[in-house]
Amino acid sequence: MNEKSLRVLEYNKIIDLLKKKASSSLGLKYIENLVPNTDFVEVKSMLEETSEAQSIIIKRGSVGLEGIHDIEDKVKRAYIGASLDPGSLIMIADTLRVARRLRNSLSSSDEEDFNYPIIQSLSNSLYVYKDIEDQIYNAIISEVEISDNASSILRDIRRRIAQKNQSIRSKLNSIISSTTYQKYLQDAIISLRGDRFVVPVKSEYRSQVAGIVHDQSSSGATLFIEPMTIVEMNNELRQLKLGEQEEIERILSELSAMVGEVSEDLISNQEILGRLDFAFSKGKLSIQMRGIEPTLNEDKYLNIKNGRHPLLDKKKVVANTIYLGRDFHTLVITGPNTGGKTVTIKTVGLFALMTQSGLHIPADYGSSMCVYDNVFADIGDEQSIEQSLSTFSSHMTNIVSILQNVTADSLVIFDELGAGTDPVEGAALAIAVLEDINSVGAKCIATTHYSELKNYALTKSGVENAAVEFDIETLSPTYKLLIGVPGKSNAFEISRKLGLSDYVISRAKEYINTENIALEDVLQNVEKNRIKAVEDREEAERLKEEIEKLKVEYDEKLEKLVSQRDKMIEKAKSEAFSIIRQAKEEVDIIIKELRSLEQERASKEKNRKIEELRKELTSSMGSLQPTVKSMIVPKVSNKEIKDLKPGEEVKVITLNQNGSVVSVDKKRKEAVVQIGIMKMTLPFKSLQKTRKDVSTNVTKSTRNIIRSKSGSVKNEVDLRGLNLEEAIMEVEKYLDDAYVAGLESVTVIHGIGTGVLKAGLQDILRRNRHVKSQRGGQYGEGGAGVTIVKLK
């Protein structure tokens, strides 16, 4: 990749931002070596790696990379047999712990959507040596301290050292506290010189205290003497400390040997940990920049949606949409100074470099980038004092180099192409340069002040105009890029706003070529029409948003109403079902009493009693009818009934039950329907004709009803295919009929299925007043798919 382009596009500043996200020197090595890649497959993989890291950070927060150290040199020393110091071993243990935890947390997860093949492939490659990790932590407390737990020998030596120290101190305390020695001592204290215990003796009493002089004070007034009585004890202490040091060296050597045995795996871990740190650094930077993974295309076009320059303040930067490479290969941008032209072209160039480095770009989802073989940029004033080159010469030297190396797969960026020389010649050179680049097929973005380039873009195929917007009212740029609109000079308008007289402005216009004036007028009209179109589009979008909002509110209210309706229907059905069951229980009692009375001899008193019970039954059914009717939410039949006759069989849609028509009111379009022994007045629209008609004489006595039932009621009922609620309604109606018909035993067919229907029905049968007993079907009766019921 062109080094000059990397510099002028400030690629190094992106690298500096990335470095701040690294957790270790291993990750920094990868970042420092990062350069844009030109291989499509590799770039795609690099971008996916960044996306995986970004997603994991968002889900998990901290990844746990803290504690990684660069241990390669230490591991290599252990491999050749060197003994490592405690600090080095602690660093190795820390790095092993990070590797183990990363492998455990990234390789497997209980989260269903935790699927990150690139990151997980890296973490799965990490070697785990928890035994080495544990032994190092068990043996070493810090960089300067070995634990007593390192070995039983070390623990014993240190115990003996402590005892010997105590013995020496006790002996010295007895010396310094004795009246004999007190006058010889400078202070009643015990000191150490080297690793020998001494007492401070006044120099004039040197001959009075037998011992070895180890030191003296700066004034010479005090001598530090090791009394002869403890010399042997100090020697023993010295021997113990030498033994301690030997044991420590043995322990460190043993731990170092363990590290050396797995040195290749640990060095492999270093590479993987560095790669993971690098990947998560990219993920962190993406989150900071609110970056996205651009779609990568092989057609050499870019489409940046609301791209934001990554080095500018996120709160102030203006997002711009930029596209290049499909309908046109060259984009010519015009507009005022400080209007954002340079920032715009730098954004495009930097996005290309970032994408090819596997970094996310701060833009909206749906942005698309491609892989260029090179990115060339000529931006800024880089005149060379050493080479005595002018601004124009400096730019032209760079442009010559670009033209010599550009290919069809390159991206070229020019800032103020042709500037720094005579405007006429500069414009001509600029057009010629763009022609040459366009003929090669490279993609190019150029900024300019020359109106000749605007005319060139208007007439040349494959070249498009663009402008940075300028607000005449505020005399300030808006930094918005408008592709397809050539930039307009605002010198006259700005001058008028600043107070320049119309006379001077008119005189100035006389010195301009009439063609240029006409072009400026056209551009002014285009700009007015564009602003009007933008306003109309914004108004249309506002209205669309309001309509969408109203639609959402309507859908929410409709959903709420439907939910309320369904709840009301379910509640009504439940209450109706409860009322019907209660009524049936009352009817059962009355029928039972009627049958009991009919078995006795008739008498006036008994006949009167029967008549009262029949009236009570009629009253009960009559009071029940409007209650149930009012609670049932009407359902309309698919086929409207125009005419009904008494005796016809109909289906009551609201109850999902069949009944017989007793009487008909054609004017009100209502019919009295008998369902079992219950009568209800229902509208035609809630009824549906069935194929089978039955004749029912509603004036028959209870005895005749019982006799007619006995001939028509079957000794079995098939409930298969019904849900539990429907089955309960059906079986209770059937048991009423069977009981009235005088059947002694019936078969309830429910099937095997999941067992829910069978269990629910058997529970209802246990509580039914007509049921004497029940049992499961036997072989030949239907087996587990039926229940045999004995009636009272």
UniProtKB/Swiss-Prot annotation:
Record-annotated Smr domain positions: 717-792
Binding site for ATP: G335, P336, N337, T338, G339, G340, K341, T342
Top EC class, one word: hydrolase
UniProt cross-references to Pfam families, sorted A to Z: MSSS (PF20297), MutS_V (PF00488), Smr (PF01713)
GO biological process: mismatch repair; negative regulation of DNA recombination; rescue of stalled ribosome
Coiled coil feature spans: none
Superkingdom classification of source: Bacteria
NCBIfam families associated with the record: mutS2
Function (record text): Endonuclease that is involved in the suppression of homologous recombination and thus may have a key role in the control of bacterial genetic diversity.
Entry similarity comment: Belongs to the DNA mismatch repair MutS family. MutS2 subfamily.
Assembly notes: Homodimer. Binds to stalled ribosomes, contacting rRNA.
Name of the protein in question: Endonuclease MutS2
Species: Clostridioides difficile (strain 630)
